[in-house]
Amino acid sequence: MIQDILHRYLFDNADVRGELVQLQDSYQQVIGSHAYPPVLQILLGELLAATSLLTATLKFSGDISVQLQGNGPVSLAVINGSNQQQLRGIARWDGELADDASLADLFGQGYMVITLTPDEGERYQGVVALDKPTLAACVEDYFNQSEQLPTALWLFADGKQAAGMFLQVLPSQEDHNADFEHLCQLTATIKAEELFTLEAQEVLHRLYHQEDVRLFDPIEVCFKCTCSRERSAAAIKTIDQAEVEAILAEDGKVEMGCEYCNAKYVFDGIDIAAIYANGTASNTQQ
């Protein structure tokens, strides 16, 4: 079974870098907590793979968010992650979605927002329109606008597994566009089934057996939600106390749910009193 792994590699004779990611468990954890329509399962798989590939390009410790928004039946699809390849995501939609719906069908007049938040330093945000036929092409458009380095992506998902590949010219005084185009032609021959079933080394050998490829140590990718009882308590404290106490009087408890992982945090009267007294709550219920 292919594990959730990202591989980075370099073409020593071309000043081009590459990445390959294969996802299963993390993908299932993202889509398993909601009854997503098939087309949305596939979109989230592609978005998860794209975010993992983007995360591997970060040169800092911090977080990344890749968010799709629009005025169509899908109002939001987002994957959040960290430089440690810890990812989570959700989507919101209304009504039935056709299995063959395009990005335009799903989002209408949509756009993609990529937010980079370093642990230290200023946040960066880039926005591009969802006006290309594929998510991969939209991400390429982001790189063309933000980094102005030739970049190409290939994204695949089938509701069970997700995978992706990434190529980018490294900053250099020399022109390596011809090498990049050649490597893109080789990479474009990849099939989803190969990425879903073959080990990364076998995939790279099949694609680039005549190239000088340097493969780096693999990086584990995982689903990780950042919700907690403490964060839920902090969210409750932002609500007017009278409103919370009204809920408590009617239901006997206040329940907070996480959209990402479906965790439930339950607070009783003693907890609520403690939250408004000093911002803490007991850890006895979840």
Curated annotation (Swiss-Prot):
InterPro entries: Heat_shock_Hsp33, Heat_shock_Hsp33_C, Heat_shock_Hsp33_N, Hsp33_helix_hairpin_bin_dom_sf. One of its GO terms (molecular function) is protein folding chaperone. The gene is hslO. GO terms for cellular component: cytoplasm. Disulfide bonds join C225-C227, C258-C261. SUPFAM superfamilies: Hsp33 domain, HSP33 redox switch-like. It is found in: Cytoplasm. This is 33 kDa chaperonin. It holds the Pfam family HSP33. Gene3D superfamilies: helix hairpin bin, Hsp33 domain, HSP33 redox switch-like. Keywords: Chaperone, Cytoplasm, Disulfide bond, Redox-active center, Zinc. It comes from the Bacteria. Under oxidizing conditions two disulfide bonds are formed involving the reactive cysteines. Under reducing conditions zinc is bound to the reactive cysteines and the protein is inactive. PANTHER family: 33 KDA CHAPERONIN (PTHR30111:SF1). GO terms for biological process: protein refolding. Redox regulated molecular chaperone. Protects both thermally unfolding and oxidatively damaged proteins from irreversible aggregation. Plays an important role in the bacterial defense system toward oxidative stress.
